[in-house]
Amino acid sequence: MSASAGGSHQPSQSRAIPTRTVAISDAAQLPQDYCTTPGGTLFSTTPGGTRIIYDRKFLLDRRNSPMAQTPPCHLPNIPGVTSPGALIEDSKVEVNNLNNLNNHDRKHAVGDEAQFEMDI
């Protein structure tokens, strides 16, 4: 049977999560861990459950700041990703090698030779 002795069951009162909007004046005030909503709003949650919603205008202004334009330190050297100059040099060498191979193939092409033999 039921643990309640015939008493009526009342639903608990729901409460909204307390929120506050903070206008940030310095990028150092942003926490390391933050969340996003499906709409793209950034927010973080305090240990007490309060959501801190970050102002979109401030974040968009910070997009063009010198710190946002500076790559992180200690990145690995990945040609074409972290070092664009290396990719350009490598692609020039590769194009020259392909041109040399194509010229070499044209000089030695005698006829239509089969690539392999196959017994049928």
Curated annotation (Swiss-Prot):
GO molecular function: eukaryotic initiation factor 4E binding; translation repressor activity
Modification type Phosphoserine: residues: S65, S83
Main location: cytoplasm
Compartment(s) where it occurs, according to its Swiss-Prot or TrEMBL record: Cytoplasm; Nucleus
Tissue localization of expression: Enriched in brain.
Motif placement: YXXXXLphi motif: 54-60
Post-translational modification: Phosphorylation at Thr-37, Thr-46, Ser-65, Thr-70 and Ser-83 is mediated by MTOR and corresponds to the hyperphosphorylated form: it abolishes binding to EIF4E by inducing folding of intrinsically disordered regions. First phosphorylated at Thr-37 and Thr-46 by MTOR, inducing folding of region encompassing residues from Pro-18 to Arg-62 of into a four-stranded beta-domain that sequesters the helical YXXXXLPhi motif into a partly buried beta-strand, blocking accessibility to EIF4E. Deamidated at Asn-99 and Asn-102 to aspartate (Asp) in brain. Deamidation promotes interaction with RPTOR, subsequent phosphorylation by mTORC1 and increased translation, leading to impair kinetics of excitatory synaptic transmission. Deamidation takes place during postnatal development, when the PI3K-Akt-mTOR signaling is reduced, suggesting it acts as a compensatory mechanism to promote translation despite attenuated PI3K-Akt-mTOR signaling in neuron development.
Alphabetical keyword list: Cytoplasm, Nucleus, Phosphoprotein, Protein synthesis inhibitor, Translation regulation
Keyword Nucleotidyltransferase: no
Similarity comment: family membership: Belongs to the eIF4E-binding protein family.
Protein name: Eukaryotic translation initiation factor 4E-binding protein 2
Organism listed in the record: Mus musculus (Mouse)
Annotated gene: Eif4ebp2
